[in-house]
Amino acid sequence: MLCRTNVLHLRPQLNKFTYLTQFLWLCLFYITFYFVLYSVLVFTNTEWPFILLKKRLVSQEKIRAYQSNDCVGQTRGLTSEPSWRDACWRALILAYLTSIYFFPILGSFPRVLKDQVDFGYIPTVCILLYVIFLFFFDSYRKSLFTTALTHSFWL
């Protein structure tokens, strides 16, 4: 008859190397999964609603830039580069319209995840951060670039 200590002694014990290999396999699976997902979404002909919306906004921006470069637009003093206010408004509209598609996707998550995490603030925070970034960066972009060139920060 075997005693209890002998049974426990015969069980295989996992060492640190086993945990490391499990972690590496998990990372490899995770990276492969997201690479496949990215390649399916970007490099195929599938058109998701927010991708269509972004393409439509970008194409309208290109049309407006082309129309402002004609002779009539140049006499009025219009430039082809949109101001930061236009970029902020486009970002707000794009974020609002993509949030329409954002919440139904969250509705398909499991009930446990929806109860634990509140996703309602994410579009608002993204909009505010993007507007702040455009306000501070885009207005000083040209001056910073010319300053960097004149003071030769690139060397």
Curated annotation (Swiss-Prot):
A GO biological process held by the record: ATP biosynthetic process
Membrane topology type: Multi-pass membrane protein
DNA repair recorded as keyword: no
Transmembrane segments: 23-43, 89-109, 117-137
GO cellular component terms attached to this protein's record: mitochondrial membrane
Keywords assigned: ATP synthesis, Membrane, Mitochondrion, Transmembrane, Transmembrane helix
InterPro entries: YMF19-like_N (IPR003319)
Keyword Transmembrane helix listed: yes
Protein's cellular compartments: Mitochondrion membrane
Predominant localisation class: mitochondrion
Pfam families per the UniProt record, alphabetical: YMF19
Family of the protein in this entry: Belongs to the ATPase protein YMF19 family.
Protein name: Putative ATP synthase protein YMF19-like protein
Species assigned in the record: Marchantia polymorpha (Common liverwort)
Organism lineage string: Eukaryota, Viridiplantae, Streptophyta, Embryophyta, Marchantiophyta
Gene that this polypeptide is encoded by: YMF18
